[in-house]
Regions:
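Glycine-enriched loop-and-adjacent helix/strand subsegments that border the catalytic/binding cleft
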Residues: 1-138, 176, 207-214
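Structured DNA-binding interfaces in DNA transaction proteins
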Residues: 141
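Active-site pocket scaffolds in enzymes
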Residues: 130-137, 145-207, 216-222
Length: 222
C-alpha cells in the first residue's frame, strides 16, 4: 500500500500573509479585509495525485498534500500592487453581504510555470473567482480568528485557454507527471516587463528528490 508517488504534480497559487491579527470571536467583512492583509507570495502546493484521488472519499485530500509546500522568499506588500487591481469575474449568484466588495477585488499577477527551464504555462490571477479579501472574510465569519503571519493560498490558478494551466494534471490530462530530479520554477510579476511599468514578485523553485535522498539529507532513518 505504501510507496513513492507516481503522479507528483504542482499547483501554481498566489498566497497572502495576514498582517494584523483578528482575535477569536471577531469577524472581518470583505470590504474591510484588505486592512488585515500585509502582502502576497508565490506558492507551489505540491500534490501527489494518486494519493489525493484515493483520499478524496470520504474526507478529502490530506497526505496527498501535507508533504510539501514551497513559498517565494519575500512578501510583496499589498500597497505596492494597488495599480494592478482588477474587477475579477462577475459573481453570479451575488455573494452574501459579508463577502460583498464595491472596489476592484482582484489582482492581475502574471505567472509562469516552468519545469527544468522550459516554460509550460503563462497565466494570471486576474481570473480568480474569489479574492483574498473574500477568503479572509469567510475564514473569520464563524469567529475562528487569524494571527499576524498566517499564510493562506488561493488554490490552483488556471486560465480558460490552452497554455494557461496551473498544474500538470490540467495541462496533460494525466499523461505526464514530475520525476526525481525535475526542477519546478514559478515566476510572478505585475505589469509589462518589456515596456513597463512592472513589479517583480520573484520566483519559487523546488527540485524533486527521492525519499531515500531526502532521509539522507535530513539525517533520519529509513
Amino acid at each position: 500500500m505504501f510507496g513513492p508517488s507516481a503522479r507528483l504534480d504542482v499547483e501554481v497559487e498566489l498566497g497572502f500573509v495576514v498582517g494584523t491579527t483578528v482575535p477569536r470571536g471577531r469577524s472581518v467583512a470583505a470590504r474591510d479585509a484588505d486592512r488585515y492583509v500585509f502582502g502576497v507570495v508565490l506558492v507551489n502546493d505540491w500534490s501527489a495525485r494518486d494519493i489525493q484521488s484515493f483520499e478524496y472519499r470520504p474526507l478529502g485530500p490530506f497526505l496527498g498534500k501535507s508533504f510539501a509546500t514551497s513559498v517565494s522568499p519575500w512578501v510583496v506588500p499589498l500597497a505596492a500592487l494597488e495599480r494592478w487591481r482588477v474587477d475579477g469575474p462577475v459573481q453570479d449568484p451575488k455573494p452574501a453581504d459579508y463577502l460583498h466588495v464595491d472596489e476592484p477585488r482582484g489582482l492581475d499577477v502574471r505567472l509562469s510555470l516552468a519545469v527544468n527551464g522550459s516554460v509550460l504555462s503563462n497565466l494570471s490571477s486576474a481570473g480568480l473567482y474569489w479574492s483574498m479579501a473574500q477568503q479572509l472574510a469567510h475564514l473569520t465569519v464563524n469567529g475562528a480568528g487569524v494571527r499576524a503571519g498566517d499564510l493562506f493560498a488561493s488554490g490552483t490558478i488556471s486560465g480558460p485557454e490552452p497554455g494557461t494551466e496551473g498544474s500538470l494534471m490540467e495541462k496533460y490530462a494525466g499523461q505526464r507527471w514530475l520525476a526525481d530530479g525535475d526542477t519546478v520554477t514559478i515566476t510572478g510579476w505585475c505589469g509589462d516587463r518589456e515596456r513597463g511599468p512592472w513589479l517583480s514578485l520573484g520566483h519559487v523553485d523546488g527540485t524533486v528528490v527521492s525519499h531515500g535522498a531526502l532521509v539522507s539529507q535530513e539525517g533520519g532513518a529509513e
